[in-house]
UniProtKB/Swiss-Prot annotation:
Segments forming domain ATP-grasp: 141-347
One family name in Pfam for this protein: Dala_Dala_lig_N
Listed EC numbers: 6.3.2.4
Name listed for the protein in its UniProt record: D-alanine--D-alanine ligase
GO cellular component entries: cytosol
Similarity-based family: Belongs to the D-alanine--D-alanine ligase family.
Amino-acid positions noted as binding ATP in the UniProt annotation, renumbered to this chain: 171-226
Catalytic reaction equation(s): 2 D-alanine + ATP = D-alanyl-D-alanine + ADP + phosphate + H(+)
Length: 378
């Protein structure tokens, strides 16, 4: 008897700065999925959050102009209906596994994971709470610190406490060179390296455009940027390590390096580091994955100082899958091919769904429970 193919739904796009990166990742994954094993549907969230159906999403996959397709599709949509944005969800009723390839807002912050949970379907990646915490740099650092995982010192600045953190005070505590980062943005959006009061104030003003929580971090001098990929649910493993080297004229691996002009960026995989340092970074990656309760996959980013001391930077719970993305490349050099990696991620999603199905949510029937007497005092 022939085995039934699994129906995989790729969700991509979204309203983040990585919309086009998401499209490229999803296209690569679609091409790599073994069509003898899987039936594949694709659903694109537009930049305004409207979910296109499979047919129209495939038109964009096949090269039609995205703006033209979206304009044509939404012209007759009644947006007074609060469910209009997700009206095409009816197409997913026979989906076996959701594969979100949405970076940043909506994709990595727990939003779309909540949708999958409501639909009671398996999905690749971390759960609702884990995704939300991992996307918030402030909550991530707090949780890692509680678990003894080394990360850079910082202060949290909000519109309410901004006056309590003038540049002079923060510089005295963390050093004159600082990084100013929105807590809940990806792709280095809104991140600034500052060295004086004027730059600091301008960076805060810009950062508040993207979030009301701003991290002001100490700057590690001339760090090496090292990456580690993690795979698994509870039984997890770390990949070999990779490194990013940017042009000497640039301050850090910023949005421009990532998406505008990456011609001067060098990716080294695997990177040759002292064995002790390599093992420490791999162990910190596994410890962080567990502390954040991640599932399926994550890429861990580190800064290594001149004394070979690694500092945890951040976690990416839905890393890119483009031709130059580090997550799949690190597994490639670790012995797992691109297509095999995708097969494993799909199985991990099914395993996690089945494990969660064993959890009981039984409640006493309302009206049958025994209650105490209510005493009204004077």
């Amino acid at each position: 008897m022939e085995n039934k193919k699994l129906h995989i739904a790729l969700l991509f796009g979204g309203n983040s700065s990585e919309h086009d990166v998401s499209k490229r990742s999803a296209h690569n994954i679609y091409d790599a999925l073994d069509k003898d094993k899987y039936d594949v549907s694709v659903f694109m969230f537009t930049k305004k959050g409207f979910l296109l159906g499979n047919k129209d999403s495939m038109r964009i996959f096949d090269g039609e102009n995205e703006d033209d397709v979206v304009t044509e599709v939404i012209k007759d949509v009644d947006f007074s209906n609060p469910l209009a944005n997700i009206q095409n969800l009816a197409e997913v009723k026979d989906v076996d596994v959701f594969y979100p390839v949405i970076h940043g807002n909506m994709g990595e912050d727990g939003t779309v994971q909540g949708l999958f949970r409501l639909l009671n379907k398996p999905w690749i990646g971390s759960g609702v709470a884990s995704s939300g915490v991992s996307f918030d740099k402030d909550l991530t650092k707090k949780l890692l610190t509680l678990n003894g995982i080394r990360n850079t010192k910082y202060v949290l600045v909000t519109p309410e406490n901004k006056a309590d953190y003038p540049y002079a005070k923060v510089a005295e505590e963390l050093g004159e060179t600082l990084f100013v980062k929105p807590a809940r943005q990806g792709s280095s959006v809104g991140i600034h390296k500052v060295r004086n009061e004027e730059e600091y104030n301008a960076a805060l003003e810009d950062g508040f455009k993207y979030d009301y929580k701003i991290l002001v971090e100490e700057a590690i001098k001339n760090p090496r940027e090292v990456e580690c990929s993690v795979l698994g649910n509870r039984d997890i493993k770390a990949s070999k390590l990779g490194a990013i080297r940017i042009p000497e004229s640039d301050d850090f691996y910023d949005y421009n390096n990532k998406f505008v002009d990456a011609s001067g960026v060098v990716f080294e995989m695997p990177i040759k580091l002292p064995e002790k340092l390599t093992k420490e970074i791999q162990q910190m990656s596994l410890d962080a994955f567990r502390a954040l309760d991640n599932r399926g996959l994550a890429r861990m980013d580190f800064l290594v100082d001149k004394n070979d001391v690694p500092y945890f930077g951040e976690v990416n719970t839905l890393p890119g899958f483009t031709n130059i993305s580090l997550y799949p490349q690190l597994w490639e050099v670790s012995g797992i091919s691109y297509s095999e990696l995708i097969d494993q991620l799909i199985q991990l999603a099914i395993d996690e769904f089945n494990d969660n199905a064993k959890i009981h949510y039984d409640f006493t029937k309302l009206g049958t429970e025994k209650v105490g007497k209510k005493i009204i005092g004077e």
